Amino acid sequence: MKAGRLEGLQGVLRKGDFWGMKAYLDIETDRQGNVCVIGIFCEPGGFVQFYGDDVNAGNLEGILGRAETIVTFNGDSFDLPTLGRHLNLDLKGACYSLDLLKVKRSLGLRGGLKELEKTYGIKRKTAGMNGYKAILLWEKYVHTGRMGPLKLLLEYNKEDVLNLIRLEEILKEMENRGAAV
């Protein structure tokens, strides 16, 4: 992993393919704020998820070890600090961070991830899901052992991660044009 951190966002997306290998990351937490699911997409490895006891520093470092940039939505405020507390990892210090929430704000856009997905036609199988419902699904899985809630939670997390790729492309196009669409 590379030392350093992205501080400013002005012009970031004009640089094309920047900072080597990217990892797109999203986490889900339980009611107490403990990480229960991690979803990551990076080339060439593709998509991987960890949940339950497999959420650990070794697994995360194994996937992110070559990443130079971690792409998230609100990751600078939520995902990365939460992983730092839960797994004792300093991902902000180890990789560049591209938080698409900050990018969309710099473009004058409003709304959260799901609202932006709707605005720009990014589809979801898990439409209507949100972070609170994700917590409830995890609790149902833990208390009942039923796989249905876990499968839905994992699908929701996967869509959060994979939709970051398309959202980044859209924001990059907007940044290159110099105006919000």
Where are these regions (language model features)?
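N-terminal accessory regions of nucleic-acid-interacting proteins
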Residues: M1-W19
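Short catalytic/ligand-binding loop motif for oxyanion handling, primarily in non-cytosolic enzymes
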Residues: Q32-G33, D79-T82, I165
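Acidic, Mg2+-coordinating catalytic module of metal-dependent nucleases/exonucleases
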Residues: G121-V181
